A protein has these predicted regions:
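Basic, polyanion-binding surface patches
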Residues: 1-115
Length: 115
């Protein structure tokens, strides 16, 4: 998974020392709202403005407001929902990465079978 590799690399290497876009062969695109660059190869990108910063010991947690979103063609269903089966999603639960996306059920399934 190239996206997983790039995510792990970007989380472990400082942008002060390395041009991560160049090193990983990623395409930077300048966002319309903030001017910050996002990664063209990602299926969904969001531009945010920082609203709060919380110091947590050796790290900081940033709370942002989404001001723009960019979604690649084919990611949304005709109804405008994210088509999870078209994405290879993962999450980080330190220190491990886990796959996301296998459909387990549909909202309301626990009560619909009781009728």
């Amino acid at each position: 998974n190239e996206t997983l590799y790039a995510t792990d690399y970007c989380g472990n290497v400082s942008g002060r020392d390395v041009d991560k876009f160049k090193e990983l062969g990623l395409t930077p695109v300048k966002g319309d709202e903030t001017g910050c660059h996002y990664i063209d190869e990602c299926p969904i990108n969001m531009e945010c403005r920082v609203r709060h910063k919380i110091v947590l010991g050796s790290h900081e947690l940033f709370i942002g407001e989404v001001v723009a979103a960019y979604v690649r063609d084919g990611v949304l269903t005709p109804e405008g929902r994210v088509n999870m089966s078209n994405l290879d999603l993962f999450t980080y639960v330190g220190p491990d990465y886990y796959s996301i996306g296998r459909k387990l059920g549909q909202y309301g399934y626990s009560v619909s079978s009781r009728s």
